[in-house]
Amino acid sequence: MSRIGKKPVQVPAGITATVDGQKVTAKGPKGELFFVANDEISLKLENNAVVVTPVNQTKDARSKWGMSRTMIEGIFKGVKDGFERKLEINGVGYRAAMQGKNLQLALGFSHDVIYEPPVGISIVVPKPTEIVVSGINKQQVGQVAAEIREYRGPEPYKGKGVKYADERIVRKEGKKK
C-alpha cells in the first residue's frame, strides 16, 4: 500500500502557508488558494513543512491521508507556478479564436461554439489549432480543458476533433471491400 502521506509537504520559497485547524492556506505570486482537510486528517506546520497524519487508523482515514497530502502539494504548486493544459485541434475547417474573453470554436457544426471561461482561468490561442488553458487551480484547469475537448472529441478513423497535446489517439482502420 502506498504511504505517500508520510512524507511532509515542503513549503516552497516565496510562498507563505498557514494551517488553521483543518484549513491550509497558501499565498504566492500567482494568488491565494486553500484546502480544507477531512476531520479524520490532522495538519501541522513544522519546520516550514506541512505534516499530514490520520487521526485514527481506520481504512477511511488512511484512504484520505495520501489524497490530502497531494491536494496540499497541488495548491503550493498552483500559487507558485500555476497549471496549464494544452489542447490541439485537428480537422479541415476546425479552428479556435478568442472573442473578447470568450473562446470561439469552429468544429464542423452549423454554428460556432462559444465557451465562456470561469473566473480564475485564462485561455490563450497561440495558433488557430492550439488552445492553452491555464490557472492556479489544478482541478479547475483540467475541468475546463475537458469541457472544451467534449465539444468534439477526437474520432479514431481520421483523428479529427479536439485532443490534449500529450494524448495519443488509437487509430482504427476503415471498412474493407
Curated annotation (Swiss-Prot):
It comes from the Bacteria. InterPro entries: Ribosomal_uL6-like (IPR000702), Ribosomal_uL6-like_a/b-dom_sf (IPR036789), Ribosomal_uL6_a/b-dom (IPR020040), Ribosomal_uL6_bac-type (IPR019906), Ribosomal_uL6_CS (IPR002358). One of its GO terms (cellular component) is cytosolic large ribosomal subunit. The keyword Ribonucleoprotein applies. GO terms for molecular function: rRNA binding; structural constituent of ribosome. Coiled coil: none annotated. One of its GO terms (biological process) is cytoplasmic translation. Keywords: Ribonucleoprotein, Ribosomal protein, RNA-binding, rRNA-binding. Pfam families: Ribosomal_L6. HAMAP family: Ribosomal_uL6_B. This protein binds to the 23S rRNA, and is important in its secondary structure. It is located near the subunit interface in the base of the L7/L12 stalk, and near the tRNA binding site of the peptidyltransferase center. Belongs to the universal ribosomal protein uL6 family. Part of the 50S ribosomal subunit. This is Large ribosomal subunit protein uL6. The lineage of its organism: Bacteria, Pseudomonadati, Pseudomonadota, Alphaproteobacteria, Hyphomicrobiales. The gene is rplF.
